[in-house]
């Protein structure tokens, strides 16, 4: 939302005295600050007022592009043909939520990149890469944390290594949070723990629950991540359940994303952005349905 964007813009300009729920999502504002310094000489004086928004856009554009690349590799690993995998990337990139998180001064693009990186490395059983990346991924956004436990559900992953990495990562998380808090004047010690963020979201989420799920605007928000592809994905899931097409097999660990996404949707005042985290599950099922429809059409022809 607008409040989120204003907070991140302030952070990129060195102001940490903002809402605690935004204060610790430091990576993208930090990168936007670096980009702003790099491109400032290239911007004419009459356009300098746009430099903050442009800096965020360039950072988010790169991150979203990386998310699209990892999504393509993820879909290839699920045995989709290159053209179908590319279609899945276009579904992701064409989503209203992806466009908003890329074009606005937001940090959600890094959240979606973190999700697809985690599930891709889980699928390809890259224990060491997961171990090395977890300390960085945990700093992206609080909502990334549950996804970091997904590798523990897989017997083929080195769980001891992942547990060690998680232990180090949480130590780094709270250390970084304490450093950020130390830069904020007149902040109480009880204000910055991660539980404050959860409590704040829970309070606002429950207050807006009826508006989110029992109003026209709320249904629009729920529909916005994947629009018609929600329905197509449900058809794809039905195809798998009925074993009409057994060529594709969606890994079971991905279904844990469902409670994560819907749980965060309840906590958040913007359920669309939270439900968009289902894209590693929704897009493959949508592609299964599309592949089935296209193959049936070819048989008729």
Task: Report each predicted region and the residues it spans.
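Specific aromatic-rich, kink-prone transmembrane helix
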Residues: 70, 110-130, 281-285
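Membrane-lumen/periplasm interface segments of specific transmembrane helices
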Residues: 158-243, 252
């Amino acid at each position: 939302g607008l409040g989120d964007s204003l907070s991140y813009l302030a952070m990129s300009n060195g102001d940490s005295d903002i809402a605690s729920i935004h204060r610790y999502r430091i990576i993208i504002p930090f990168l936007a600050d670096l980009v702003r310094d790099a491109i400032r000489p290239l911007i004419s004086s009459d356009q300098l007022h746009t430099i903050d928004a442009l800096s965020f856009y360039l950072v988010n554009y790169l991150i979203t592009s990386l998310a699209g690349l990892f999504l393509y590799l993820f879909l290839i690993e699920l045995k989709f043909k290159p053209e179908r995998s590319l279609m899945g990337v276009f579904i992701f990139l064409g989503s209203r939520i992806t466009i908003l998180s890329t074009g606005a001064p937001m940090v959600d693009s890094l959240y979606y990149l973190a999700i697809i990186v985690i599930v891709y490395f889980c699928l390809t059983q890259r224990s060491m890469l997961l171990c090395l990346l977890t300390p960085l991924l945990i700093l992206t956004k609080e909502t990334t944390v549950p996804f970091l436990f997904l590798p523990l559900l897989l017997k083929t992953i080195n769980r001891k290594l992942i547990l060690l990495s998680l232990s180090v990562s949480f130590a780094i998380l709270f250390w970084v949070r304490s450093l950020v808090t130390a830069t904020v004047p007149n902040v109480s010690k009880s204000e910055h723990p991660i539980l404050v963020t959860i409590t704040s979201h829970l309070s606002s989420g429950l207050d807006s629950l009826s508006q989110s799920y029992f109003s026209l605007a709320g249904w629009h928000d729920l529909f916005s991540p994947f629009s018609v592809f929600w329905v197509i994905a449900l058809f794809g899931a039905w195809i798998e359940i009925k074993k009409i097409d057994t060529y594709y097999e969606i890994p079971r660990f991905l279904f844990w994303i469902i409670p994560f996404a819907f749980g965060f949707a309840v906590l958040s005042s913007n359920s669309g952005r939270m439900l968009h985290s289902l894209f590693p599950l929704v897009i493959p099922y949508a592609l299964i349905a599309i592949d089935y429809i296209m193959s049936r059409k070819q048989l008729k022809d």
